[in-house]
Amino acid sequence: MSQGWRGGSGGWRGGGGGNPYAGAWRGRPWRGRGQGGTWSRNNGRDPVCFAPPKPQLTQTTLDKYIPYKGWKLYFSEAYSDNSPFLEKVRAFEKFFKKQIELYDKDEIERKGSILVDYKELLQDEDLSAAIPLSSELKDMPEKVLECMGLAIHQVLTKDLETHAADLQQQEGLRTEEAPIVNVPFIHARVFNYDTLTSLKNLRASLYGKYVALRGTVVRVGNIKPLCTKMAFSCNMCGDIQCFPLPDGKYTVPTKCPVPECRGRSFTANRSSPLTVTVDWQTIKVQELMSDDQREAGRIPRTVECELIQDLVDSCVPGDMITVTGIVKVSNTRDGGFKNKNNKCMFLLYIEANSVSNSKGQKGKSTEDSGNHGASMDFSLKDLYAIQEIQSQENLFQLIVNSLCPTIYGHELVKAGLSLALFGGCQKYADDKNRIPIRGDPHILVVGDPGLGKSQMLQAVCNVAPRGVYVCGNTTTTSGLTVTLSRDTTTGDFGLEAGALVLGDQGICGIDEFDKMGNQHQALLEAMEQQSISLAKAGIVCSLPARTSIIAAANPVGGHYNKGKTVSENLKMGSALLSRFDLVFILVDTPNEDHDHLLSEHVMAMRSGAKEIQSVDITRINTQNSNTSILEVPSERPLGERLKRTGEHFDALPHQLLRKFVGYARQYVHPSLSPDAAQILQDFYLELRKQNQGIDSTPITTRQLESLIRLTEARARLELREKATKEDAEEVVQIMKYSLLGTFSDEFGKLDFQRSQHGSGMSNRSKAKKFVSALNRVAEQTYNNLFEFQQLRQIARELQIQVIDFEAFIGSLNDQGYLLKKGPRVFQLQTM
């Protein structure tokens, strides 16, 4: 038996390989066993739905002429000139005849389906006059889609017959030698369906209706074969019949089609060529919450969707998709044995007709940053508003002050968060010969409690076109990355996306970053490689997590101690800290003028009065003798230029700002100009020159890449394709402000021999002296295990004076010099 649409050689051909006119979709008709076949195991339906006729039976229905060769493929009813579907088929046929030259026939042959734009159907005047398409497609989707499929089937059949006749005429063949065209079943997949249905409106009243919904894929099942037609052989006479299985529900024939036979028992013949199986997959889609749909205290709704044939593998967890399909019901799976009355309980699901993956579509190499805003639709009103915003004189100041207007001051911190919103451009995303370089900056805000870190974080996640906000103390590792769950019905393992995967091509805000415990290791790969690898239960895979991580943390002890480094204040590893492009340190310094203005601002916000004129709140640095590149004064600092001017400030609403950010991320892909590159290179080389000490902070190419990313984001903020010299200078000022917090000690002095990751300035020499003494003792005693009392004795002998000896040992433990092996027992790691 020939497989697929082939009965000889080539696509959709039959009748032997020696046919000189063999072409696509041509072949001999089905003549029984052993002849060129026209059914398919992998296609939706087959042209013959009964067993080969026996000689003693008369098939009178085949003698009637049917103008539509594929009628039996689409309709179970016999053809009639009075059929109510004929008018619809003719209207669709007229529409497809106009479009036939636009369709790729090879693509239709490969997929077995054709994509039809719903808006083009509505714009066709002849079709609109013949069929009330919008109401009929919604209320009778199966019949309308079958009419559409039969129409394209007929148009393609006639087109190929015309093509075959032309070839026959050129070669001078006789009419009886011409091959017969057989086109298989073709699915009509309607996309761009304009009326989106929210998941909360997906109720029993929509059963059998055609709907479109948009959401995020949170779970993808395995691909399985689904039997749509099964061949059954009669146990009494041996006759074979093909029995349809609607919706994949197994049913057995009730009687034999042979009139003389009264058999009632049948055997399924799974290996028969009449048995048709298709690829089948289930996905779980979670709703997207817009501003007017946010409901406090409710978990996001989900719905199951079934994909068949060419729709399988069209999405992965984390993708944002639009599914159009028919609402159907299935029996409830859980609790079926506990309660007999559960037979009346059903679950709604979507039988997908088309899937539009708005995130999985990759652009050209110049758009390697991905379609960050691809899921956003822009109306003409939106585009005019974006044009109006872009024409503002001081756009950077407008966006920075619109980000979180309730928080007073901190303009440079808001500037860094604004740049993270827009992001840089990812390089080599589609080049399989090179490793991609991330374009999303990561930002950490550390500071005393009560300075508005969490509010700024929530504002960023709210403005982002795709933002996920999580709290560190209630987050697990699998909740951040990927959860491996078992399906209750099939027992198969499936992937459920966590916060980082759901925030792909967006923002992931993590509050209480210092209270995450052991979950920090889960972020290392996601922050640099921008993917999450999983190896569990025999499943090895990698999921994309191209997200900017914005984190807020409180220092240990409740107050930031400038005598310690960032690593010591947060008790966090250097591997994680080095991945942040900007680290902002907010210190609550008492100051009479600032406190007075801040209190006035809070009272004005609470009372609804006109906002006071803001002044820039900057860190008060004492005079110091160190001269460095971080302290070179500019004509007018960026912080001064970003502060609000005038008595009244009109901030952009978040909904409009979200549209602007989405437009910039989708359509603007800037590159560095030579002047900007020179400024960044000079600043980087100066930093390297000032950090040549043995114990100095490692200024690596990560800092240079951070500068490039932020400069691209600065140009993207103003919708420019080139980053200018001024962009680079402003980014350098933001980077200086960030580095000031890292390098300044408890006296306000700049000390370039301290880093984010090492010890505090006062403890460094003591730590080196103490560790070298431990090395000597361990070499003499051949034992690298020390009890706490022994460590205290060694420190006393060396006359090392520290305020808190336990904190001193804890610092050595954090830096990897000592490893805690048990209660008050430490192992030396440097020998």
UniProtKB/Swiss-Prot annotation:
Major localisation: nucleus
Occurrences of domain MCM (ranges): 395-602
Protein's UniProt name: DNA helicase MCM8
Complex and partners: Component of the MCM8-MCM9 complex, which forms a hexamer composed of mcm8 and mcm9.
Primary enzyme class: hydrolase
UniProt entry keywords in alphabetical sequence: ATP-binding, Cell cycle, DNA damage, DNA repair, DNA replication, DNA-binding, Helicase, Hydrolase, Nucleotide-binding, Nucleus
Reactions performed catalytically: ATP + H2O = ADP + phosphate + H(+)
Compartments where found: Nucleus
